[in-house]
Amino acid sequence: MQTVNIHEAKTHLSRLVEEAAKGNVFIIAKAGKPMVKVLPLS
């Protein structure tokens, strides 16, 4: 499972959404602390 920092997530949100839609799960971290898990709905 990939972890991205919040700045990278804001910069590349469209790409991350596309990756999640393909089934890739990842974590968004702030200051090195995991905050949320992003995963596809289906």
Predicted feature residues:
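Bateman/CBS regulatory modules and CBS-like beta-alpha motifs in cytosolic regions of diverse proteins
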Residues: 1-16
